[in-house]
Amino acid sequence: MKLTDYVKQVSLEDFGRPFIHHVQWNRRLRSTGGRFFPKDGHLDFNPKVYQKLGMEVFRKIVRHELCHYHLYFQGKGYQHKDRDFKELLKAVDGLRFVPSLPNSNSKPLKLYRCQSCQQRYQRKRRIDTKRYRCGLCRGKLLLINQPED
């Protein structure tokens, strides 16, 4: 997929207006699907959103960024707080927030339980059960599930 051609196509189909600036992938984006730069008019998109969430979600993110783009160059309110932006975003069925990306490097949690009071503890890191005790009753901790690494 050629990103620039795709954004131009979405702009014409959904907004009826041409997109004439630069578009690029930006791997450094973490918690956002895309960015609009008013200074020079270019757009950045997160490639992980396209790869992991699919074309349908990515198209809605492109619409979101194009809302910023077209409203800015029309001299209307282009920020998230502006009524013009909210109305246009709703009209073109764009996403307000990017869905959470599946995190491939998240470790499964280890689950511990106190043998006396049955209090449960979830931890990312291993607890030395010979050294540490329950914070409520000082009972011994027992590892319930050991996830496969």
UniProtKB/Swiss-Prot annotation:
Any GO BP annotation: response to stress
Transmembrane region(s): none
One Pfam family cited in the UniProt record for this chain: SprT-like
Cofactor, how bound (note): Binds 1 zinc ion.
Binding-site residues, Zn(2+): 64, 68
Key word Cytoplasm present: yes
GO cellular component, as recorded: cytoplasm
Annotated protein name in UniProt: Protein SprT-like
Organism (species): Streptococcus pneumoniae (strain Taiwan19F-14)
Species classification: Bacteria, Bacillati, Bacillota, Bacilli, Lactobacillales
